[in-house]
């Protein structure tokens, strides 16, 4: 699962990228194979919430449903978060 040191460094970056709109959940591997990579390489896995703000999460269609709907504004946040996390990681690796 997520490396604690990487997570401690990434969460503040995600909070800046999402203007503080970050929810920390219990650990979950869901059905992602990414967790296997984290056995060998320290990293951090996170979910990007894409359900529209005016829709209850409980009523949202799941990923593989033909009714799945993505609030495309969330994609901008996701790209910003990944870019900022990458820049943060590269800057920190120069000083480590």
Regions inferred by a protein language model and the residue ranges of each:
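Metal-dependent amide/peptide-bond hydrolase catalytic core
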Residues: 1-96
């Amino acid at each position: 699962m997520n490396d604690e040191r990487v997570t401690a460094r990434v969460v503040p970056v995600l909070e800046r990228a999402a203007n503080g709109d970050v929810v920390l959940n219990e650990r979950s591997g869901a059905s992602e194979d990414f967790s296997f990579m984290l056995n060998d390489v320290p990293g951090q896995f996170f979910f990007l919430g894409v359900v529209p703000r005016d829709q209850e999460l409980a009523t949202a269609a799941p990923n593989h449903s033909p009714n799945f709907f993505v609030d495309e504004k969330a994609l901008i946040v996701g790209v910003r978060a990944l870019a900022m996390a990458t820049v943060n990681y590269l800057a920190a690796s120069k000083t480590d």
